């Protein structure tokens, strides 16, 4: 994935798949986009567009609670939309994640988007294990194809939010680490998203 700045408010992203779905995701956040070629998309009328890792460089190691809550709601809206059309991502890939206007996060790894069949998705493409936000079910997996519950994605989202709010390096016991935000909305959401049984996981937008 490459980003090319065309003008002050216009960007081109190259090396994409399923750009029709991507345009729908951008529309959730009132971001205007169009494409002339199948593997690229042009995003117009935005202040900034950058890769997630570049955005991270301008942040403190952790973000504040309200920012973390907004980040969760951002991804939850995307996740629920994808489920509505019968699809779900297997995981978040931080190397293929863009940030629009410094606070809108849009996954570009739609090659990792799968059709939900009987509440399951079958992952039939290789994925990198060098990813701190890999879904719990994929961390120890070594076989392709691999079938998981579509809510497997929720653990990937939870790990991203946990890392930006608390820090994955601070505690490998997620439930212990969450105690610093005990009683908050994110405490319960992240706890449910990190349940061992994927079918019991839950995301809620308020």
Segments the model singles out, each with a brief description of its role:
Residues 75-88:
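Protein kinase catalytic-loop region centered on the HRD/HxD motif
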Residues 71-72:
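Activation segment signature within eukaryotic-like protein kinase domains
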Residues 181-196:
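Conserved C-terminal C-lobe helix
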Residues 25-66:
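Conserved structural core of kinase catalytic domains
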Residues 1-41:
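ATP-binding glycine-rich loop module of kinase domains
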Residues 91-133:
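Activation segment/activation loop of eukaryotic-type protein kinase catalytic domains
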């Amino acid at each position: 994935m490459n980003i090319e700045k065309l003008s002050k408010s216009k960007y081109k992203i190259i090396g994409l798949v399923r750009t029709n779905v991507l345009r729908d995701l951008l529309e959730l956040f009132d971001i205007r986009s169009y494409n002339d070629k199948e593997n690229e998309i042009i995003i117009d009328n935005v202040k900034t567009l950058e890769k997630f890792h570049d955005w991270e460089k301008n942040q403190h190691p952790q973000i504040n609670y309200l920012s973390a809550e907004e980040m969760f709601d951002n991804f939850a809206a995307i996740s629920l939309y994808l489920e509505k059309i019968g699809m779900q991502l297997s995981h978040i890939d931080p190397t293929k994640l863009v940030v629009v206007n410094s606070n809108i996060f849009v996954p570009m790894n739609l090659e990792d988007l799968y059709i939900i069949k009987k509440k399951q998705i079958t992952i039939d493409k290789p994925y990198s294990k060098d990813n701190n936000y890999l879904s719990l079910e994929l961390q120890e997996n070594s076989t392709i194809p691999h079938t998981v519950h579509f809510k497997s994605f929720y653990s990937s989202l939870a790990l991203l939010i946990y890392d930006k709010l608390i820090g994955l390096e601070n505690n490998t016991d997620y439930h212990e680490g969450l105690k610093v935000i005990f009683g908050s909305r994110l405490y319960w959401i992240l706890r449910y998203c990190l349940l061992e049984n994927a079918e019991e996981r839950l995301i809620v937008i308020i």
